[in-house]
Amino acid sequence: FGLFLFSLFAVLIFGQAFANASEVFNLSKINQGIVGINIPLKNNKTKIMIQKDGKTYYYDVKTEKDMLPLQMGSGIYLLALLENIEGSKYAVNSSKSVQVNLDNEKISFLQSIRPVYWRKESKAAKLAKELTENMDTDEKKACAIYDYIINNIEYDRNKLTNLNTDYIPNVDEIIASGKGICFDYAAVYAAMLRSIDIPAKLVMGYKEDIDAYHSWNEVF
């Protein structure tokens, strides 16, 4: 669903870099937990790797310009542009090591960045503001939004069986349709919380009690 763990790649080849890393990666907002990418789209599969302290995230390149999260706190990050050679083999086209000093350690969980996109004028943001008006604590606000989501969005099993692996939720469309999968629930919840300045992380992975790949939230 847009980000993958290292184990999904059979071979990752570090070879000669071809693209100029300074042109690929926009570092103007790294202290806000955001790295911009600027990549001409090609026919072959392309991914961005973001790595820190042994933990790695991979993102499919969907558009020529995008914003990706630096969500592992302050420190040294390795950023790399990967291009598919064949099958599950990827070569490093360009890479750059950067020092990130976040303005706030949770700041990336307030941003509109993949896979949680939102705007102040969006339905999700307006609804979050309406639901939490006159509430005096973040806990009350988080609970109010949670209750709304679980009572107004129905789990869509049909969608799950027909979903592409590069799917990214449109939170306003999910709210309007009243249907979604776990990824949708988590994206809507994170977007609504972020819009009212509550840091929220969207987590993806496996749980012991759930067979399929799953999504959930961490709220700070």
Residue positions per predicted region:
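Secondary-structure boundary elements
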Residues: 110-177, 188-190
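Generic detector of short, locally flexible boundary/turn motifs and exposed helical patches
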Residues: 43-46, 165-168, 180-186, 194
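Residues in flexible loops and secondary-structure boundaries
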Residues: 58, 135, 163, 182-183, ...
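N-terminal start-of-chain detector that recognizes signal peptides
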Residues: 20-22, 50-53, 172-173, 187-192
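Short, solvent-exposed coil/turn segments
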Residues: 32, 168, 212-213
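Solvent-exposed loop/turn segments at secondary-structure junctions
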Residues: 152-155, 179-182, 207-210
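Hydrophobic/aromatic-rich core segments of domains that either
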Residues: 184-220
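N-terminal accessory/pre-domain segments preceding catalytic cores
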Residues: 2-139
